């Protein structure tokens, strides 16, 4: 019943996003996250596929494909990732024009549990960005995630949980070529959502994310599947 309610909310929110016609209005992100730890090994892999739309469906904002190799030192409580991402960005409206980006990244993921039911995760990420028609750039990111089970103390099957995160982006270079500059602060994302643990390998989340830069702000509906392969 809880899972059916989750699906109903998904489609009601999607219908609402279709009614938006302005690029500053709420868009939608559809995301699939995957991870795998090799048996009896400190090595694994993880990644994500994301389709981001300006309005709901039919007007691509971004297509992001990202994956990396992971290493988890014994008894260290941290997971390191070396990965690559490819990003295609579209223009709002009728234009079919796109721009591309290749991105190498290094990441440290540190989980932490506070009390009986507060699941924190710290993510530190450093990116080397090769953006079309721009000079080489780097960027620093820090994300603090918090998941709080509502109907149990653990993120176990059938658990409904509150999901929050805040992510800060800082540019490593101000000069991006041809006399163009960006500011030190790149953007900030704040998210509030609800999740459902279907089984030990799969969980779903639905929520709303507000993204702000120095120039603009935009809300996004986010629908995600998290899969331990």
Could you describe each region identified by the protein language model?
Residues 24-30, 61-65, 100-104, 136-142, ...:
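Residues that define the transmembrane beta-barrel architecture of outer-membrane proteins
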Residues 38, 49-55, 84-90, 112, ...:
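Transmembrane beta-strands of outer-membrane beta-barrel pores
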Residues 32-36, 67-71, 106-110, 126, ...:
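Residues on the lipid-exposed face of transmembrane beta-strands in outer-membrane beta-barrel proteins
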Residues 119, 123-203:
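Outer-membrane beta-barrel transmembrane domain signature
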Residues 20-83:
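Start-of-domain marker
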Residues 45-49, 80-82, 108, 122-124, ...:
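Membrane-embedded beta-strand positions of outer-membrane beta-barrel proteins
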Residues 1-22, 229:
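Bacterial Sec-dependent N-terminal signal peptides
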Residues 37-43, 72-77, 113-119, 150-160, ...:
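Short loop/turn motifs that connect adjacent beta-strands in outer-membrane beta-barrel proteins
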